[in-house]
Amino acid sequence: MNDISSQTPGILATAREQVLQRGEGLSQEQVLEVLNLPDEQIEELLALAHEVRVKWCGEEVEIEGIVSLKTGGCPEDCHFCSQSGLFETPVRSVWLDIPLLVEQAKQTAKTGATEFCIVAAVKGPDENLMRQLEVAVEAIRAEVDINVAASVGILTQEQVDRLTAIGVHRYNHNLETSRSNFPNVVTTHSWEERYETLKMVKESGMEVCCGGILGMGETREQRAEFAAELASLEPHEVPMNFLDPRPGTPFADYPVMAGSEALKTIGAFRLALPRTTLRFAGGRELTLEDFGTEAGLLGGINGMIVGNYLTTLGRDQEADVDMLNRLSLPIKALNRSV
C-alpha cells in the first residue's frame, strides 16, 4: 500500500498554485506549515517567495528613511524598547529641530528613497506634538521631493483627520506581535487600541503601514497568528523587525533569532501577504548580516529602511544601494500619492 502522506501535495506546492498563480495568501494554518518546514527547504521557500513578490508586487524595491522627532521619555512599557521612560536605558528624552529634520529628509531623498517617516516616542500625540508634526510635514513637502509618512502612536479620529489634511500619505503603527502574545510584550495599553487606530487610518484613505518585531518569545503558532492578523488589515506595507536586545529593557537578555528562522519567517509572511510591501527594518544587520539580507531580498522582501534606525545603528546608506545594484534589484521611483 502506498503511503498516503507521500501522495499529498506539500505546502510549497499548494502555495505555488494558491499564492503564485491565484494571488490568494496562505491561511494561518498554512503559514504554520511553512514555518515548520525543515531548514533544508528554506532555499526552495525563498525562491517561491521571490517569484510571488515579483509577480504580485513587481521587481522594484522601495527605499525609506526614518527619523525621530521626539526620542525617549515614553510612558509606555513596551519591553523591547529603550525609549521607554520606565526602564534604566542610555536613551534620554530629546526633540529634533525642524531644520535638522528637513536636512535628514534631503539626505534620505539623495539615496533614491521615496518615503520619509517621522517618528515620535509617545503613546499618542498631544497638541504640542501635533503642531510640531504639522510644521515638519509642511516644511519637508515644500523643500524635498519625497513622500512623508508618520508614526506617532495611538490616534483619535480628529488626529487622523488632521494628518490626512496635511498630506501624510502613510501611517505606521505596528501591532508588534500577535494578539495572544501582546500581553507578554506590553502591559500599559492593549493590542485592541492599536488595532482601532489602524482601522481609522485605513478608513481615512492614508496607506496603512503595520508590522512588528520577530523574536520576542513568540511561538511559531503565534507568528502564524500574527501573519493572519496583519493580512486581515490588508496593509500597504509590513515592516519586519528582528529583536535587537537593548540594554536596560526587560528583553535585554533575549537571544537573537537564528538567521534560518528569520528567513523562513520572511518567506512565510510573503506567502501570507502576496501584494504587500514587506520591508526590512530594525535588527536585520544583527540577525541576518549581509548574506542573510541578500537572501531576504531574493526571498520575498521588497522594501528597506536605509541608514540608522531610531536607537540602533543601521548599515551605511550607500552600502545598501550598492547591494541592490549588485543584486540587479531596481529602486522604486517616486510616485506622489498626495
UniProtKB/Swiss-Prot annotation:
Record's keyword annotation contains Ribonucleoprotein: no
Organism from which the protein derives: Corynebacterium urealyticum (strain ATCC 43042 / DSM 7109)
EC number(s) stated in the UniProt entry for this protein: 2.8.1.6
Function description: Catalyzes the conversion of dethiobiotin (DTB) to biotin by the insertion of a sulfur atom into dethiobiotin via a radical-based mechanism.
Protein name: Biotin synthase
Family: Belongs to the radical SAM superfamily. Biotin synthase family.
One Pfam assignment: BATS
Cofactor(s) required, per the database record: [4Fe-4S] cluster; [2Fe-2S] cluster
Binding-site list for [4Fe-4S] cluster: 74, 78, 81
Database matches in PROSITE patterns: RADICAL_SAM
GO molecular function: 2 iron, 2 sulfur cluster binding; 4 iron, 4 sulfur cluster binding; biotin synthase activity; iron ion binding
The record's free-text note on cofactor binding: Binds 1 [4Fe-4S] cluster. The cluster is coordinated with 3 cysteines and an exchangeable S-adenosyl-L-methionine. Binds 1 [2Fe-2S] cluster. The cluster is coordinated with 3 cysteines and 1 arginine.
GO biological process, one term: biotin biosynthetic process
Assembly description: Homodimer.
Record has Kinase as a keyword: no
Residues that hold [2Fe-2S] cluster according to the record: 117, 209, 279
Keywords: 2Fe-2S, 4Fe-4S, Biotin biosynthesis, Iron, Iron-sulfur, Metal-binding, S-adenosyl-L-methionine, Transferase
SMART domains, alphabetized: BATS, Elp3
Domain Radical SAM core: from-to ranges: 59-284
Metabolic or biological pathway, per its Swiss-Prot or TrEMBL entry: Cofactor biosynthesis; biotin biosynthesis; biotin from 7,8-diaminononanoate: step 2/2
